[in-house]
């Protein structure tokens, strides 16, 4: 493919509105362009990368018996009313009317559509299991689109749905999808973790998220690609390294989720779902009497602890929530933070939000900072974190502004449900007892769910079982954010290319090192002087030999300065660069492997053999 015939609008500078490096590079390197807020055009390079990823997906899904189809993106609102999600999905749902004033939506996901199709076609257990998927644009009316393809209003998604007679059968397909996802993301060259996830608005029972890990900005070895003029990182002057560190730090860390994972085992979970090892305390302490004391101007845990000369751990943090419009008290030890997702899941609530201070006064008679679990009126549900039951003679709010109670003891002074509702902390022991928890930022690239009968119940999707009884179909749901993959890959494979000029000056510039399986082309063939006939003849010979061996070749045939060509090549990020320069008359070409920065001159007749050797481990 001739570069002069492609739309690759590279930029000399980073776009000023980009905050994460993946967004900046995909715009600067000519992969995408924003059409309007949260809506992007995928230019030829991005389209080729996405199509390569689709090919990987299709190959792996063929192995597990998943069948591709295509459903409409424009959906009747009646289906979503039937499932109940038309009212509950929220403001992200695009709602519209046709000329007859009938209600429609633009699909953000397709559980209802697939459930209806199967409900109308499948009547017997003998027709199951079914494993269907599609690759399609989805729509969500994001309030604040940001970070390039990571948070958009239109996006490409692979969504799959499986239909079963039993949960045992669902488990088999769920595990097959888990293995297929691992194979897909591994082939795509991604550093990822499969983690315990939250089902959120999708509904369902079990779920697993797949997160692309955002690289550590402090590890220079993984960010820098050194030119052959620089033997090692140690040869770069300290002041230059400080400039490079500042450049790395200037970009926001991408990834909307924090992942907690074990340093020694396979345990990994979204921070919203993560837990740590809990060992109940067995110490015996004489129980003090309850005493009400004045605590003037003490609104926070640390202020109360300082006033009473105790540790924050001895103070019970009391938070008031409204769960489906009913009050719930959540209790934590003072130096812990609430995990609202865990609390919501424990309660089985559809909606959970912190109460207002006005609601606190109405329900408990006091404002924030003075709330507590003692002497409550009937009907207020109390959920305490597991660690609360280890406390003795603790301090809690007296439900009277400016006052607290000392000598508070669980089970004697209040009754509560105990559950893990706290946010874990880095360095705590992993729940499996192996290693400690470490945190990383991650980009969600895939999610699989055991939906169970969530949709078949509400939409009457039943089959006749072996005994002729009508039973609901058991479902699974499996998503991959296809357009997000481009962001995740660039985030992980962005590099700073460092070189040294003949005068001894150090230069560094951003570029991409695409993994081979997703690179839009395999080889970037650059002719330094397109007006040199010998160079042109050699270019055509090399291009033909590469293509004959199955390489996808992007040939830079533009009449541009060589520096501009090399700069664009670094930005575009193809794995191999072959340059035809001053030694074209001798048949000599230069090979450069982008991932390492290594380069070598060879005769054109030996090019294919040399590439086979240089890339055999890649």
Curated annotation (Swiss-Prot):
Catalytic activity: tRNA(Pro) + L-proline + ATP = L-prolyl-tRNA(Pro) + AMP + diphosphate
Keyword Aminoacyl-tRNA synthetase carried by entry: yes
Keyword Ion transport assigned: no
Record's GO cellular component terms: cytosol
Keywords: Aminoacyl-tRNA synthetase, ATP-binding, Cytoplasm, Ligase, Nucleotide-binding, Protein biosynthesis
Enzyme nomenclature, EC number: 6.1.1.15
Cited CDD domains: ProRS-INS (cd04334), ProRS_anticodon_short (cd00861)
SUPFAM superfamilies in alphabetical order: Class II aaRS ABD-related (SSF52954), Class II aaRS and biotin synthetases (SSF55681), YbaK/ProRS associated domain (SSF55826)
Pfam families for the chain: HGTP_anticodon, tRNA-synt_2b, tRNA_edit
GO biological process: prolyl-tRNA aminoacylation
Main EC class the enzyme belongs to: ligase
Top-level taxon in the UniProt lineage: Bacteria
Cellular localization per UniProt: Cytoplasm
GO MF assignments: aminoacyl-tRNA deacylase activity; ATP binding; catalytic activity, acting on a protein; proline-tRNA ligase activity; transferase activity
Principal localisation: cytoplasm
Physiological role: Catalyzes the attachment of proline to tRNA(Pro) in a two-step reaction: proline is first activated by ATP to form Pro-AMP and then transferred to the acceptor end of tRNA(Pro). As ProRS can inadvertently accommodate and process non-cognate amino acids such as alanine and cysteine, to avoid such errors it has two additional distinct editing activities against alanine. One activity is designated as 'pretransfer' editing and involves the tRNA(Pro)-independent hydrolysis of activated Ala-AMP.
Domain notes: Consists of three domains: the N-terminal catalytic domain, the editing domain and the C-terminal anticodon-binding domain.
Family classification: Belongs to the class-II aminoacyl-tRNA synthetase family. ProS type 1 subfamily.
Subunit structure: Homodimer.
Protein name as annotated: Proline--tRNA ligase
